[in-house]
Regions:
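Extracellular/periplasmic head regions of type IV pilus-like filament subunits
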Residues: 52-120
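Amphipathic alpha-helical segments typified by the pilin-like N-terminal helix
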Residues: 19-37
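Short, functional N-terminal and low-complexity linear motifs
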Residues: 7-15, 30-35, 76-79
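Intrinsic disorder/low-complexity segments enriched in polar/charged and small flexible residues
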Residues: 4, 18-21, 77, 88, ...
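N-terminal alpha-helical signal peptides/signal-anchor transmembrane segments
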Residues: 33-58
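N-terminal single-pass transmembrane signal-anchor helix
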Residues: 1-23
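Short, surface-exposed interaction loops/tails
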Residues: 100-165
Length: 165
């Protein structure tokens, strides 16, 4: 009987002490997702500024190209990073696509929607039907073939248009 009581108390204490650690882990994951979304927003703004100054289509711009053009803010992690988690493509119609450079990116669509104020230009790419699924209202935007750029299935995508002068 005493063994059962001691075991119950030990399990309860283990759960009690483990609960804050799980909350801290979840807070760290949320913060990392917020950071990734913020970095993607800065990257998107830099790409838009680059294509405003360089009116080229059916291409993408590298991180080195963005740095060389001086469109990355000096305070941004992107300005000092040798690599970036994001890439881009501008199609012939001038539409800009911002998406992860590789598969396996963290799920950050909720954070992107918060940053974009629930814009329909933010969504999840569905490779099966080549659409951008918007979780805001369930719409699907058909995406064209992006030259040699490949958007990973299930990746967050943020559309943009280079501003006109």
């Amino acid at each position: 009987m005493w063994a059962v009581l001691i075991m119950v108390v030990m399990v309860a204490l283990g759960g009690w002490y483990g609960w804050p650690a799980e909350q801290r882990r979840e807070a760290v994951v949320r913060q990392q997702a917020d950071d990734d979304a913020g970095t993607m927003a800065v990257y998107r703004e830099a790409v838009m500024a680059y294509f405003k100054a360089n009116n080229v289509t059916d291409t993408s711009v590298s991180l080195a190209g963005l740095k060389g053009a001086g469109v990355l803010p000096a305070w941004s992690k992107l300005a000092t990073s040798p690599t970036v988690a994001w890439t881009n493509y501008r199609d012939g119609a001038g539409q800009i696509y911002i998406f992860p450079a590789a598969a396996g990116a963290r799920p950050i669509v909720a954070e992107l929607l918060a940053l974009s104020r629930n814009s329909l230009n933010v969504g999840v790419y569905r490779a099966a039907d080549h659409t951008l699924f918007s979780p805001v209202d369930g719409t699907r935007i058909a995406l064209p073939t992006l030259g040699d750029a490949v958007i990973p299935d299930g990746a967050p995508v943020w559309l943009a248009q280079a501003p006109c002068d």
